[in-house]
Every structure is written in structure tokens, then in C-alpha cells.
């Protein structure tokens, strides 16, 4: 492990402030290693801002190969891997609907990260904007004891997690759009505007009641 070294926190709440000090130390001749407790820095984790500041300051940046959840999830999804886009976490509120509408017609495989508390909501929205028949693979707990991949249509995967409590962090892989799927997605979107809401499962009701009691929105 790392011993006798000075450690400091560098995260999304302080990275703009800490990056300047780190770059100054680098310019002074020190070596700095940026690591995360899981995944790879810069991939849905802090790192981009510090790397950019270091490069602009003329500091050499080297990268060691590291693990990132979306690659094994993509490979094991059974969906095309030759062309894909990594979207990470969708906007929680503002811009979420607009982004989903834009992506619904993308021809390449798409990759999303999601928390267990929002995964059912996201799958519902995929059904709404992408169409219920769009192929999806939802992978959780990658490389851990309880790793699981649920594959099927967006509707089938959604229904699975409406009845089975989602646990662990998720990677959701979605197939790209064909002309036929584009037509179906538009029809589903129009239908969803007048359709009755999806019946709430016991798990969803439990989570909603907990959130209302805590007085907070679902966040990571």
C-alpha cells in the first residue's frame, strides 16, 4: 500500500481549489499521483480539471492503465462494441429530457452510469424516449461477488428491477437506433403523453416513502 506519503482529498466539491496548489507543487519538482477509490480518474470521477491545469502549466502528465466499469459491461452486454458513446450520469433534473430525446436517435451503442435509487426511473425513461423494444443490458457490481447482468428489452429490464430491488452501482448499455426503432420510439413518446403511469411496485413505494420522510431527492 501507500505509506509515508502525504495524502490529500481531491473531489468534485474542492477540485477547483486544490488543483492550483497541486499544480504549483508539480512545477516545484514534486511527483503527484492521482488515484480514485474505484474506477479511473476523469471517467465520471474527478481528474479532468487537474489534468487540464497541469498540461496548461507545462507539466508532464503520464497515465497508467486502470479499471473502468463501462468497458467490461459493454463487452459482456452482447450489443455492438465497434461504435459507442459514453454518457456517464444523465442530468438529474434540468436537461435530462432534452438529452434523452437527442440520444434516442443516436445510431451507436450508448453507455450510462446510474445509482440503484434511480435505475428504475431511468429505465422507465428509456422506455418512453427510446421505445420499449430497445435492447438493454443493465450490469451491476462489476468484478465483485454479486456481479449480475440483466439483458432484454428496455421494458423487460425495467419490469425486472420493479420486482427485484436494485443494489450496487449500475452500468446501463443501450443499443443504437435503427430507422424502425426511431419510428417506434416516436410513437411510444406520443403514446406516453396520454398513457397512465406505470404501476408503482412495492420497492418503488418504499423508496418514495423513505425519500419523502427524509425530505430529500434521490442523489448519489
Model-derived segments and spans:
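Short, hinge-like loop/turn segments at secondary-structure boundaries
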Residues: 2-4, 24-26, 51-53, 77-82, ...
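A contiguous loop/helix-start segment that scaffolds small-molecule binding in enzyme catalytic cores
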Residues: 30-31, 109, 113-220
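Class I S-adenosyl-L-methionine
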Residues: 1-64
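Short hydrophobic/aromatic-enriched beta-strand-loop microsegments
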Residues: 3-11, 61-62, 81-88, 133-139
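A charged, well-structured terminal subsegment
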Residues: 25, 95-111, 129, 180
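Conserved phosphate/pyrophosphate-binding and hydrolysis machinery centered on Walker-type P-loop NTPases
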Residues: 40, 44, 67, 90-93, ...
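Short, well-ordered secondary-structure micro-motifs
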Residues: 20, 45, 73-75, 97-101, ...
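Class I SAM-dependent methyltransferase SAM-binding "motif I" and its flanking Rossmann-like core
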Residues: 49-106
